[in-house]
Amino acid sequence: MLSLQEFVQNRYNKTIAECSNEELYLALLNYSKLASSQKPVNTGKKKVYYISAEFLIGKLLSNNLINLGLYDDVKKELAAAGKDLIEVEEVELEPSLGNGGLGRLAACFIDSIATLGLNGDGVGLNYHFGLFQQVLKNNQQETIPNAWLTEQNWLVRSSRSYQVPFADFTLTSTLYDIDVTGYETATKNRLRLFDLDSVDSSIIKDGINFDKTDIARNLTLFLYPDDSDRQGELLRIFQQYFMVSNGAQLIIDEAIEKGSNLHDLADYAVVQINDTHPSMVIPELIRLLTARGIDLDEAISIVRSMTAYTNHTILAEALEKWPLEFLQEVVPHLVPIIEELDRRVKAEYKDPAVQIIDESGRVHMAHMDIHYGYSVNGVAALHTEILKNSELKAFYDLYPEKFNNKTNGITFRRWLMHANPRLSHYLDEILGDGWHHEADELEKLLSYEDKAVVKEKLESIKAHNKRKLARHLKEHQGVEINPNSIFDIQIKRLHEYKRQQMNALYVIHKYLDIKAGNIPARPITIFFGGKAAPAYTIAQDIIHLILCMSEVIANDPAVAPHLQVVMVENYNVTAASFLIPACDISEQISLASKEASGTGNMKFMLNGALTLGTMDGANVEIAELVGEENIYIFGEDSETVIDLYAKAAYKSSEFYAREAIKPLVDFIVSDAVLAAGNKERLERFYNELINKDWFMTLLDLEDYIKVKEQMLADYEDRDAWLDKVIVNISKAGFFSSDRTIAQYNEDIWHLN
């Protein structure tokens, strides 16, 4: 392999020192693509196809250089020429192929599949503009297309192409590959992204609006196009079928190339269905097998023995149910297969709760996945128990052997080595680098002799990361923050169940408290980051309230020195990699029973933040690992919450009437906030809290405030706080996605 200087000289006829950062980025892009192109693709008879609507892969340059073992050499070579790799990386645009935890998990998983040397590819779509780019203006979220596809990028066009049949036309796909290089491995996998050459951005008008009926020109423009109308729902079905038909044809082709006669397809392929978006892969595989002469019974049997389903949510709205008439309109050739699958279920089981097509003519995608797959997994211990005992109990009673738990994980290459190099290098220095491959070795930190030195170093690393975040926000958003304040951070997509609104009510509490003369021991900066779906009005209202409070506080000289609220614009993986290493208080405050797992909680823990959370998702497992004295838990537990829903016993108006709560909620429509905001939005959200509050914000609010105040007080005992930090970092090894993927392989995939 050429040195970087030789590569740059050949490309530009210049030295590194003579190149601009833009030229160096393109050189490094092609340098790392060349290095990964020289690695052979993983082989092995059986392969996992991880099909997902989202892959939130983040910027790839540094991640790939780390995995290829080139990072340190490249950094030194650039520095010797007076260049900074971090500044070069600024040129890179983040791929907009995902949005939330689902997509980030998929990205961590394909990284770990490659790192463990397993034969497995990600399969998805190549969205040209992703979800959207978030712009914060007039204290509201505005949306514009998130253009990330420049002329030179990480995609490699493949020669593969497939015909995808719809009711009235057939579309021809193009396959692009992104190499997935595992950490220090000799081989690689790929992320296979299907696209359409006919997609045309000129049809986008006014923000992210476009003609939803012009499928040939709109199909891969956006992730999760607005489905609040009929055309939007149909477009989602077009997208999902395009993804799974291409994926299914790829699976069959690759199996045949390796010697399969298709009767033995399950020996060659396993399909992991990541949430319900790829569910149509089941009838599509059956269709393709029967079209090749395999009889229906055998085709169903083959598909059942090669598909596995991961459930990521118990929210009814997220368990997709498509009207059969919509499927008839888009993919009529799948409808007879789905009807036959449903007929077989109804012939065997009389319980209407388990049917695929319900009495309203809606097709339940998760039900099809469970009946016609061989594995169903939840993504945290609590979540899996809720599936078995509550949400999917009817299915667990039928198929107990199918259900298993796979607690989510994160890749430590991205979230420690890349995001927090100072902490990573320090851990290497005192523990060795064994944790790079065996994350449990972080536990050695607990028994490290000189705790005082470790604490001093952790303090200085955290202070450095806070200054780094402050510079980043000043540069990118024009926001000045106090790096000597406590950093309290909540970053995740905007949803009522994640309860950003509860944190906003805490902000109001703290504002009023400071106004009353109760000055905190040190300043506090509360960060929010996340996007709200354009059709999700209440989520947009929550963003509006947060931004209004930010303005009210900034304009109040009695409060501004002590409290600041920052909404990070266009939150993404890049922003997360600045925020997470700088965090003191990690906000994981979903309503108990509603967050399947969460992975932000794991990233914060690994980087030395302490968790403020409910007993929900993976918070439960964090609490078990670190002990109750090293995590801050508040709120009702999942059993209580499930019981309140079952009995319709929660009345937000009763909680609103409480002395500690009413002034906070009323402040939403106070003159001070109304002066900064939109009356309609603020009044709508105020009424929502008092009259509905479906995710029980007011139920947990007083306990949340109490525990957060305790946390702020505890922060002042730096010695005791850092003891807790050390325990959290030490115990984070369990949450490596390498562990998760090893368990998927052992229990579900059975790859060599």
From Swiss-Prot:
Cofactor: pyridoxal 5'-phosphate
Keywords noted in UniProt: Allosteric enzyme, Carbohydrate metabolism, Glycosyltransferase, Pyridoxal phosphate, Transferase
Entry's Gene Ontology BP terms: glycogen catabolic process
Entry EC number(s): 2.4.1.1
Enzyme class, UniProt record, top EC level: transferase
Modified sites of kind N6-(pyridoxal phosphate)lysine: 603
Catalytic activity as recorded in UniProt: [(1->4)-alpha-D-glucosyl](n) + phosphate = [(1->4)-alpha-D-glucosyl](n-1) + alpha-D-glucose 1-phosphate
Family note: Belongs to the glycogen phosphorylase family.
Protein's UniProt name: Maltodextrin phosphorylase
Species per Swiss-Prot/TrEMBL record: Streptococcus pneumoniae serotype 4 (strain ATCC BAA-334 / TIGR4)
